[in-house]
Each structure stands twice: as C-alpha cells, then as structure tokens.
Amino acid sequence: MKFPFRVDYGGGIRSKKQVQQLFSLGVDAVNIGTLIFSDRTAFNELLAEYPTRIIASLDVKDNRIAYRAWQENSTFQIDDVLPDLQSQGLLKLCVTDIEKDGMLSGPSLALYRALKQKYPNLDLIASGGVRDKKDIIALEGVPCEAVIIGKAWLNGNLNLRELC
C-alpha cells in the first residue's frame, strides 16, 4: 500500500517483526523508544537495515529518559545514550519534553539548541509544548527537521493550510 502522503508511525513498537510489518503496510518511518532499552541488539539491527527510516524517540523529564509510555524512568540522560546510537548509524531523533507535552506552554528551545549543537548531523524532531506558528518558526531556527504539533492542532491554534 502507498499513501499519498508521508506516514511516520510511533507507539507500542516492541519488536523487529512489528517494524517490518509496518514497512510492508506502507509506513515510511517508525519512531522507536522502548525497544532502544529493551532490546538494543534488535534496535541496532533495524538501524543497520533501515537507516533512513528509523527515528529514535527519546522522552525526557528532568533530563532523564522515560520509556514504556512514560511508565518507567531510567537513570540515563540523553548524552548517555546518543553517542552510541549515533555510532550505530542513527540519523533521526525525536525528543519529547514530557513536562511540556500537551501543555501548550512553548517548546524547550534550550534543550533542542543544546542537542543540535552537540549532535549537528542528527535530524532533530521537536515534540512537546508547541502553541502556535511562532513556536514552529522558533524551532526552525534551532534548526529542527520537523515538529510534532499535537494539541496545538487539535485545539485549533494551528491551521494546516496556513503552515503549508
């Protein structure tokens, strides 16, 4: 199946087989978080096989990574994980600031700037806190490759036609 638009899928991915099934259904890229910690070997194999289609999804709270739908807090910080992921071939990273997600309080610009400065070759996707078009413009300046607009779109703060 081929969609007339790009489809990135995320949530609940726990195995290499699930990723392969999603790709066979026409999904362009997958966001993977928990698998990074539950089965690093499988995640690294996916990176090797699909380097442009795998997005590492790291959710952070108080500078610590959470996973399993934010149910488990790790002792890891982003900088504990990213160098190894990059050495395995990671090209795309989505970072969600848990404290900002769904709050419409503005994105964590300092966090994204720091990440882009340390990891300039990663395509960075910002998630959490976006309120309006001004926030998207600010994130373009980081620069972020993409932005998850979630609640801002659902609440009507963003008009997709206006963004295109």
Where are these regions (language model features)?
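Catalytic cores of alpha/beta
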Residues: M1-A29, A110-A146, L163
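A cross-family glycoside hydrolase active-site/sugar-binding cleft signature
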Residues: D8-G12, N31-G33, I55-D59, C94-T96, ...
